[in-house]
């Protein structure tokens, strides 16, 4: 009507239309794959010799903390020795922008794994000041955690590329 000059201006010009964009949902780890990963890691833990047991305990503890807290890989890597209370299960995390927050682990079997890890690595933990340490007695870095996760998912026969952040999304659902 506007083009043929029957009306001066189309009334539709005053209507504002918003189209809702499709939102991609975050990727989560299916329960079966989490169970498969943890079962594999616990099996490896039971089969390891004493020398590698302390690092296997660390890896199991890291994965359990991921799933129990929904923490970011940066937050787990930077847990200080004095930021975790193994009796109460309270952990102080330093998040984005230096924001401090507390998370609670109430699962007693996870706390037992954390206590065993601490008992076998106490000297290295105290030396570094960080709760999760590498074989050189320093902080277990974010990149090392990512590589560890990749290694165990492959060993467990999981084809999906599982990232640390996927634990965060899985925790929230």
Language-model-detected regions and their locations in the chain:
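Conserved catalytic core of the tyrosine transesterase superfamily
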Residues: 1-173
């Amino acid at each position: 009507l506007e083009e043929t000059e029957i009306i001066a201006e189309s009334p539709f010009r005053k209507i504002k239309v918003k189209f809702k964009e499709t939102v991609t949902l975050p990727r989560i780890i299916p329960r079966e794959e989490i169970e498969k990963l943890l079962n594999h890691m616990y099996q490896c833990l039971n089969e390891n010799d004493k020398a590698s047991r302390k690092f296997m305990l660390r890896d199991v503890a890291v994965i359990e903390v991921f799933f129990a807290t929904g923490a970011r890989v940066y937050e787990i890597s930077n847990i200080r020795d004095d930021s975790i209370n193994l009796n109460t299960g309270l952990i102080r995390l330093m998040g984005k922008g230096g924001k401090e927050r507390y998370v609670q682990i109430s699962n007693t079997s996870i706390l037992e794994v954390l206590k065993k890890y601490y008992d076998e690595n106490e000297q290295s933990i105290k030396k570094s000041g960080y709760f999760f340490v590498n074989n050189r007695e320093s902080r277990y870095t974010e990149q090392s955690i990512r590589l560890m996760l990749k290694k165990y998912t492959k060993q467990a026969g999981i084809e999906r590329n599982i990232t640390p952040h996927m634990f965060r999304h899985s925790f929230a659902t």
